[in-house]
């Protein structure tokens, strides 16, 4: 029995075809599929024309950022049209991250990429989700917000001038060009997130130098910006889950009226936590500093992409 798994964002979709022995037969990429922003014909064109498979799948599991509860029936219908006779299931990217990280065990699942999202997962379903709100109102921990903090630092002077000079050379932009990218051109969030490789490179390069050197001091200044981004993610997104679990275990009267308590059979204490996404992957050290060293959470996995975990989940 062949299984087809998709992990889709707005820009690209990663596909893996798995055979009956659990082996990966084929992997490929197509355009991103987001049913919120795309017409049926556009989605079907990608599924039927861009996705070329050596064999027909019997099961199709699609995880995407645009697959809300309201969009699930429509996405399932499109998958059924593209793969007649196959069992199909469309889910959001958050449940995909949770399954990839924890399988059927409970945990706090987090996505840290261009944007940020998180949820409390009971091993089957999402129990609680702090709304991410996007990079203007929220998205703490994301690449877009890290880029925003970085630009604020270089232009307002909280980061060393040498970093600003190197960044302007690296990006080929000046102050008016950056303002234009952020406020006048589309997809400002992607532009802001595109700054993160520079930040990562500068930290890695600076850490090669001895204590007291300018390069190391500059790297540590950038490291503190990354830490502040992850602190904000913890405080604004993770604390609600922790408070909910603690109230369920210690005093259910603290729960909001009508809220069901966290299932005591899922274990004592705060559930384990895991992360998916490029920002979590490339900034693993500061992420662990904040989550493990400062807040004493049990970080079990940090994955750049969820596909490996999804394959394990669907072939177990």
Could you tell me what each predicted segment is?
Residues 1-59, 78, 82, 101-108, ...:
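ATP-binding/phosphotransfer module of carbohydrate and carboxylate kinases, centering on a glycine-rich
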Residues 9, 16, 65, 95, ...:
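Anionic group-transfer/hydrolysis microenvironments
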Residues 31, 63, 119, 131, ...:
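Residues in well-ordered beta-strands of folded domains
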Residues 61-68:
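Polybasic, low-complexity association/targeting segments
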Residues 68-165:
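Phosphate-binding/catalytic loop of phosphoryl-transfer enzymes
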């Amino acid at each position: 029995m062949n299984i087809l798994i998709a992990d889709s964002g707005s820009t690209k979709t990663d596909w893996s075809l798995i055979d009956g022995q659990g082996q990966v037969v084929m992997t490929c990429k197509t355009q991103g599929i987001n049913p919120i922003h795309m017409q049926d014909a556009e989605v079907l064109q990608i599924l039927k024309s861009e996705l070329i498979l050596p064999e027909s799948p019997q099961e199709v599991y699609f995880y995407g950022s645009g697959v809300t509860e309201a969009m699930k029936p429509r996405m399932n219908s499109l998958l059924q049209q593209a793969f007649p006779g196959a069992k199909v299931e469309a889910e959001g990217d958050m449940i995909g991250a949770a399954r990839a990280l924890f399988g059927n065990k409970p945990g706090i699942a987090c996505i840290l990429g261009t944007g940020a999202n998180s949820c409390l997962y009971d091993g089957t379903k999402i129990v609680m989700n702090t709304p991410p709100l996007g990079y203007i109102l929220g998205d703490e921990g994301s690449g877009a917000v890290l880029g925003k903090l970085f630009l604020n630092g270089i232009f307002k002077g909280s980061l060393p001038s040498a970093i600003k000079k190197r960044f302007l050379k690296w990006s080929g932009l000046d102050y008016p060009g950056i303002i234009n990218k952020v406020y006048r051109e589309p997809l400002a969030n992607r532009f802001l997130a595109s700054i993160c490789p520079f930040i990562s490179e500068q930290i890695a390069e600076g850490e090669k130098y001895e204590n007291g050197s300018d390069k190391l001091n500059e790297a540590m200044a950038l490291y503190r910006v990354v830490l502040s981004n992850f602190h904000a993610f913890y405080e604004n997104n993770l604390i609600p889950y922790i408070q909910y679990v603690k109230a369920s275990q210690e005093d259910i009267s603290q729960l909001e009226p009508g809220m069901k308590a966290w299932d005591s059979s899922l274990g004592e204490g705060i559930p384990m936590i895991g992360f998916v996404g490029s920002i979590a992957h490339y900034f693993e050290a500061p992420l662990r500093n904040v989550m493990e060293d400062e807040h004493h959470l049990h970080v079990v996995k940090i994955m750049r992409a969820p596909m490996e975990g999804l394959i394990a989940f669907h072939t177990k």
